[in-house]
Every structure is written in C-alpha cells, then in structure tokens.
C-alpha cells in the first residue's frame, strides 16, 4: 500500500512506496491530497500555481496508478476544488480561466467518468468552498456586484445531491 504525505513547507506531495522509498509524486506545487472514504484512493489538484492550468488527479493507493481525471475543459475552464462524496462520486468546483477563485459545482462519477453540472451561474457568482454531509453539499461562495468584479458579497447555499446521483 502506498502513502501520500503533504509537505506544507513547499506544497508538494511526497510518495512513500510499499517498500518505504520516498520520492515526489510530481514536479509541481499541488493541493493537499484527500483520501477517499474507503481509504484506497486519493484526489489532488496540480499544479496549484497562479496562472497555471490546474488538473484533477486520482491516485490509487493500492497499485500506485496516478491518473489525470480532468484537465482544462473547452480550453477555458478548469478544476478549482474537489471533495469526496463517496467512493464513486466527487464534488468539484470548475471555474473560468486561471484568474477566478471559484466556479460552478459539478459532480463527477468515477465509475463512468460522467461530469454532471449542478449549478449554472455566470462568472459573477462563484462557489469557492465545498463541504459534504449526509447527502447535502454546503457551498460557500462570492457574488460580484458588477461586471468590474471589484466588490462582492458572500453567500452560502445547500444542494441536495441525491437529486443528481443514483
């Protein structure tokens, strides 16, 4: 079984093999990996650097496979955040470009790679943080008051994801 250790000092992920060997998982600054509810897989975003095209990866702690799940979408949208719903579904924030903090909420089905859009807001309204609890997705975000995107208000919204999953 492989292990992932997040190095907060340089925002890198260290891979510890089943033999205790340590090496960097990749060459980029990454988000802290999140382990699946079953403890067999992990997700992380990389590179997590300003003005970089961020991608979502799935790491299999059993066999060491590291798979890119989502890169840029239509050349303009990319993952900004991801959390586990269960061993089959992820909740994602996918936003516009490299400059936005958040975006719309999606579900990703790991069994068939289906991406399901849950919210459909323009760039002025963005979810920036997701939390999951007992079938409900708690979204925290910002809504800009004008197209200039200088002033904003914070909002919270709760989504019943059972409406979108089996």
Functional labels for PLM-detected ranges:
Residues 9-13, 51-57, 99-106, 145-161:
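Structural motif
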């Amino acid at each position: 079984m492989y292990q992932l250790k997040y190095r907060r000092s340089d925002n890198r992920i260290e891979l510890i093999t089943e033999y205790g060997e340590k090496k960097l998982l990749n060459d980029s600054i990454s988000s802290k990996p999140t382990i699946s509810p079953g403890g067999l897989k992990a997700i992380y975003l990389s590179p997590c650097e300003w003005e970089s095209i961020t991608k979502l990866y799935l790491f299999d702690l059993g066999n060491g496979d590291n798979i890119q799940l989502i890169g840029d979408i239509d050349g303009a949208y990319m993952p900004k955040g991801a959390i586990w719903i269960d061993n089959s579904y992820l909740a994602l924030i996918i936003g516009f470009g490299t400059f936005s903090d958040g975006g719309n909420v999606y579900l990703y089905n790991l069994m068939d790679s289906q991406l399901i859009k849950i919210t459909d807001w323009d760039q002025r309204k963005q979810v920036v943080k997701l939390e999951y609890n007992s079938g409900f997705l708690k979204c925290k975000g910002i809504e800009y008051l004008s197209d200039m995107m200088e002033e904003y208000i914070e909002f919270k919204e709760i989504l019943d994801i059972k409406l979108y999953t089996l």
